[in-house]
Design a protein with these regions (language model features):
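Transmembrane signal-anchor helices characteristic of membrane glycosylation enzymes that use polyprenol
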Residues: 35-45, 56-63, 80-108, 168-173, ...
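Membrane-interface alpha helices of multi-pass inner-membrane proteins
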Residues: 35-40, 234-239, 244-270
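Membrane-interfacial loop-to-transmembrane alpha-helix junctions, especially the N-terminal start
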Residues: 18-30, 75-85, 184-186, 244-247, ...
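Transmembrane helical bundles and short interhelical boundary loops of multi-pass, membrane-embedded
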Residues: 30, 38-43, 297-493
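Transmembrane alpha-helical segments
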Residues: 59-61, 168-179, 229-241, 267-274, ...
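Perimembrane helix-loop-helix junctions
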Residues: 264-294
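Active-site lumenal/periplasmic loops and adjacent helix-entry segments of GT-C-fold
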Residues: 97-231
């Protein structure tokens, strides 16, 4: 299930530099940008989409010849071997058990996820509601599956969502293997288990509304549509193998999948770009690369699109933090304990320091009300980079592994995910349901067991049916917008 990868020089300090990852780079680029191109083709006017697509192609392709000699001297990094199929199968199972595909009982957030896919399959693109408003939502994750659904039906689209998400997770795992210098099944497990030490935080009675950095399994269950693309981009970024001229374009694509994640990850993207720009042979030429204007134009189009949403103005600003003892415990158990393992190897890595600074400063800012959306979504980039550093530390230092696994066991967030997995089947959920006469268990083990196995709210979330048009629902303004004249100039509304 695991194996060390060959290196051109024994004892090389950077094992991630030891292999040719051309195929992995282009697979990652295609996974991130294909939905963007679909969106441009069906949502934008041709006089905007065609020049922009051409500029993007030039930005991605230029500079490729200079990298060929270095690539040819390295052993290839195959996408598939026997362990790869096991990992891909495990990620497919994770997507299904997390509710994607609608085959099992789901978390309540899937009321919107299910309706979005059905709307995209059933409606012409761009989606215009009967009252003239338009769908404004980060639909990128569903566009390729929905395109398949328009040809072959909703059932195919649902299956494609699972496969599309599993492929994104698979690519992220491969980048962890590249960065750590070790292709290991256990790195896939580490990736899924990574997150805040939620069990420990709950036992201490900490206020999770003040700081809750969602783990990988939580992100996949609730918002794989936004989190998987962002995780993939920032793990790729942390590996140091992303071509500098790709960074602006692929970062602009993350704004399509999650604007708040792009905001939270902006310092990390800038830091890594500067780090690689300083090390390039032609730094001045990099500043005038065509990928920059392409990224600016693409980002501006996404910004105008999301700005047209009908949602009430978001409450945003800053708030005091680290004013209570529990705040320090939250920061420590959310990510600082993981960072301690990585400090020895990466304390001189500017991206690692920037990751720590971003994770420490994010709690001072908020967007929206009691649930801080900036922490929920804007923390994904920092956590993805920290995951990459932790995976590399895990591979380099076998003596630390038992301690890392112990932390991950506390960070698996079983209170959140595992009950849904246990209640994925209605029959199993009925079996686990406590009787009406059963009082709240008094012992700690019994309470923990119930938290671990039973989610009464798990069911097929189909209240919205086949459409996102529900004007009376309090969530509807967040997914609809009134097209303005300037928006109609860019988009085919």
């Amino acid at each position: 299930g695991s194996g060390k990868m060959s290196s051109p020089a024994a004892g090389a300090p950077f094992p991630e530099r030891a292999f040719n990852v051309t195929a992995l780079k282009w697979n990652t680029c295609a996974w991130l940008l294909l939905p963007v191109l679909v969106f441009m083709a069906w949502w934008m006017h041709w006089y905007v989409s065609i020049p922009l697509a051409a500029l993007m192609a030039v930005g991605l392709a230029s500079g490729r010849r200079k990298e060929l000699p270095e690539r040819e001297s390295l052993p290839s990094f195959p996408l598939f071997n026997r362990s790869s199929f096991l990992v891909l199968g495990a990620f497919i199972a994770l997507m299904v058990l997390s509710g994607w595909g609608e085959w099992v009982n789901q978390h309540p957030d899937h009321i919107v996820r299910n309706a979005c896919l059905r709307e995209l399959v059933a409606s012409p693109w761009p989606v215009v509601f009967p009252d003239g408003d338009v769908l404004i939502y980060n639909t990128g994750f569903w566009l390729v599956p929905a395109l398949a659904g328009k040809v072959a039906g909703l059932g195919v689209a649902r299956a494609f969502v699972v496969l599309w998400g599993a492929w994104g997770l698979f690519l992220a795992w491969l980048w962890l293997c590249v960065f750590s210098g070790r292709r290991s099944l256990l790195l896939a497990l580490l990736m899924v288990m990574f997150g805040s030490l939620l069990n420990f935080q709950c036992w201490l009675g900490l206020d999770l509304f003040r700081l809750h950095y969602f783990g990988t399994a939580e992100q996949v269950m609730c918002s794989a549509n936004a989190s998987i693309p962002v995780m993939l981009f920032f793990i790729f970024l942390a590996s140091g193998r992303m071509p500098p001229h790709w960074m602006p374009l692929l970062f602009a694509a993350t704004a399509f999948y999650s604007p708040l994640a792009a905001l939270g990850g902006l310092p990390l993207a800038v830091c890594q770009w500067l780090r690689q720009w300083k090390g390039s042979r032609t730094p001045r030429r990099s500043l005038f690369h065509p990928s920059f204007p392409a990224a600016v134009m693409l980002g501006a189009c996404f910004l105008l699109y999301y700005a047209a949403v009908n949602a009430p103005s978001s409450h945003m600003g800053w708030r005091p933090f680290y004013t209570r003892p529990g705040d320090f415990l939250l920061a420590g158990t959310s990510f600082l304990l993981y960072a301690l393992f990585c400090w020895r190897d990466f304390r001189r890595n500017s991206l690692f320091i920037c990751t720590l600074a971003t994770g420490l400063l994010l709690p001072f800012f908020y967007v929206n009300g009691d649930v801080n959306d900036l922490l929920c979504k804007g923390s994904v980039p920092a956590m993805a980079c920290l995951l990459a550093f932790l995976a590399s530390t895990w591979a380099r230092h076998p003596r630390l592994r038992i301690w890392i696994w112990l932390l991950l066991a506390l960070g698996l967030a079983p209170r959140f995910n595992v009950p849904y997995y246990c209640c994925s089947s209605s029959a199993l959920q009925e079996f686990l349901t406590p009787s009406a006469s059963c009082a709240e268990p008094s012992s700690f083990p019994c309470r923990e067991w119930r938290q671990l196995t039973y989610a009464p709210q798990a069911r097929h979330q189909d209240e919205w049916g086949r459409t996102m048009h529900h004007p009376g629902h309090r969530w509807h303004p967040y997914y609809s917008g009134t097209p303005r004249p300037w928006l109609r100039f860019i988009y085919r509304f």
